[in-house]
Amino acid sequence: MNYDAGNLSTYVYKELGGKLQLAAWDFNNGFDNYQWFHTETDRLYTVENSWFDRLWQDESFKEHVCERYRQLRETTLADEHIAEKIASYQAELGAAVDRNFKVWGYSFDENLLVGTDKEGRSRDIGSYEAAMKQLTDTIRERLAYLYKELGGN
């Protein structure tokens, strides 16, 4: 989930003789990590972009997207598989998490924290544990929404 997908953090390319490919540029604002506001998990952000809006008008395209999502939700995007992947990435990071916070931990100083949403709530993450909770909660909520929107019908 990347609120600026299709606008800032994605690009389209095509190899000679190949199909159009969509790729992510970065995920710095993905998974509810945007500094200035909470990213809702229950909307399709890409349809706000004219490219995707036009694609989404094509019934065949929609059917293919929904079918592919149903397939992936049973394997790669299954809750259990996602949890295992996150756990394996955490294990791989190991002590690097502590080293990162030794170098960059000052960025959590309350005098430096600037991200608040429109209700005045802090958008700044204060710990690795809080960041992981936000990430896993956001992914779980997002997958449930997408199943309802794309795969459960």
Predicted regions span which residues?
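Middle-to-C-terminal accessory/interaction subdomains
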Residues: 1-153
